[in-house]
Amino acid sequence: NKESKYSPMAKEWYRLLDGMYEENCNISPVSFYKTSMIIANQNDIEFGFYNQNDVQEFLVFFIDSLHESLCKKVGINITGSIKNDLDKIAFECMTKWKEYFKNCYSKIIELFYGQMASFIDVEGEIKSRTYNPICFFALPIANKKDITLYDCFELFTAPELLNGDNKWFNDKDNKYYEANKRTVFWKFPNVLIISFKRFNN
């Protein structure tokens, strides 16, 4: 996408990769680094102001930049008929996916983005459904011995009681309700990027 303000990022990344596969070649990422800083500063991204940042912040910025430089409008068609509740959720997920990416889709989305579904349950009735794309999975670490990655995913998706000051607000009637929040992974990306939350608040 030549019109994208992020295109220089993709070009510098290509040059860097191209040089890495050359024989007897010295590699310096200075040009790639400078281009990253310029693009970040131009877009008011905190990463670009030479402050201390971690690799997660840069990786999100980098993936988003590649996506913006490569994306284009696409036609996304949803076919099939709704026969049960699961089909209804699938249709809603795909509809949201289409809304997010129909005007800006790239191979980066296919590789690095998944989708999460969150449900708000009040007295046994689902009152709210949200479907969001996700690129980076920040998993909590289970407080037990011999933990596995599956334990961390289970903790990440554990049901959450919304009560007290954290009650769910229903904008249809402008009231707060005690509710249960449930989160599931609807679609995993082909490349799963995970970080672990090492600290508790």
Predicted regions and their residues:
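UBL (ubiquitin/ubiquitin-like) substrate-recognition surfaces
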Residues: 1-201
